[in-house]
């Protein structure tokens, strides 16, 4: 079992289940996704494109993107993580979600559910935002202390968690995470890093544009 910050790993490539893309196909799909992201005209379009593209993979159960934002007192007061939160000044807000249950076919696209907000340091997602470190857990178990929904992990057969911080010039802007029903190798983390880097630049540019407009008013 591996539960660690992402790092280069060596070894034989695991057997590929039927329908799973080869590493070469994966890289080609990643490049194609980056080109499509460049054509998007808004952050929401980019987020939806990324989440839907990853969730369309046979092995992916859920793909999500959270943004790190300043919080408001009214939001904190009603947040289910209020008493676990270490910093009531900012938290992660779910900005994109796509996935499908293998149990009943339910599609996970809602942005206001149980995990629509994460406090810094809570679970793997919150830890990634707090530390700015990518995490690759390739033997996920429901009883792991960072798992916030053990029943979901068990029922959906989640085997791997891949999480990348969205970092621009040393500043964490959010978290990009994928929950897979198959074991993923280090190359999968590399591909996620490429997408995460583009996401971070897009977010930073959008924030800079918003700040410029605010100063002009």
What does each model-identified segment do?
Residues 114-122, 131-149, 159:
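Short loop/turn segments at beta-alpha junctions that line or gate ligand-sensing/allosteric surfaces
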Residues 164-176, 189:
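Short hydrophobic/glycine-rich mini-motifs in sensory/regulatory modules
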Residues 1-45, 49, 56, 173, ...:
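Signal-transmission linkers at sensory-effector interfaces
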Residues 52, 64-116:
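GAF sensory/regulatory domain recognition
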Residues 28-35, 40-56, 62-69, 73, ...:
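Short amphipathic alpha-helical segments
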